Curated annotation (Swiss-Prot):
Part of the 30S ribosomal subunit. Forms a tight heterodimer with protein bS6. It comes from the Bacteria. This is Small ribosomal subunit protein bS18. GO terms for biological process: translation.
Length: 147
């Protein structure tokens, strides 16, 4: 008796695979010719909570409109209509991540040693004075007389 002979049993592999509802590109449905980079409210729907552009498989946009959408978002970010990062990152600043190595390794203890201040020794050096003979300008400009 083969599998085809058993009408009450499901096909091999059990239940059928889950097939999600096919997503339709909202720009194609609305017949949008150009995606406006100035419409930040519409563009914000295609940005994740971390400030990244959502992929096609999540938003359902077609390849053509996904490229145009990415360019519009980048243009809006460049002229400061949209943020590059999400709001919680802007509010908190650069938050250090947890590092288990840093937490497990104790900080080195500095031995409290008596540190004596450095003593500066200044040696006096005698510099001989050199006297140069300076001629007045009037005498220096006269040519030497030949005898």
């Amino acid at each position: 008796m083969s599998i085809q002979d058993r009408p009450n049993r499901p096909a091999r592999g059990g239940r059928g695979r889950y097939t999600p509802k096919r997503k339709i590109c909202s720009f194609c449905a609305e017949k949008v010719s150009r995606i406006d980079y100035k419409d930040s409210a519409k563009l914000a729907r295609y940005i994740s909570d971390r400030g990244k552009i959502e992929p096609r498989r999540r938003t359902g946009t077609c390849a053509r409109h996904q490229r145009a959408l990415a360019n519009a978002i980048k243009r809006a970010r460049f002229i400061a209509l949209m943020p590059f990062v999400s709001e919680h990152v802007r509010r908190q600043g650069n938050v250090a991540t947890f590092s288990p190595i840093r937490e497990l390794r104790p900080e080195p203890k500095i031995a409290e040693a008596k540190i004596e201040p450095k003593v500066e020794v200044k040696a006096e050096v005698a510099v001989p004075e050199v006297k140069a003979e300076v001629k007045p300008a009037a005498e220096a400009s006269k040519p030497a007389e030949s005898a």
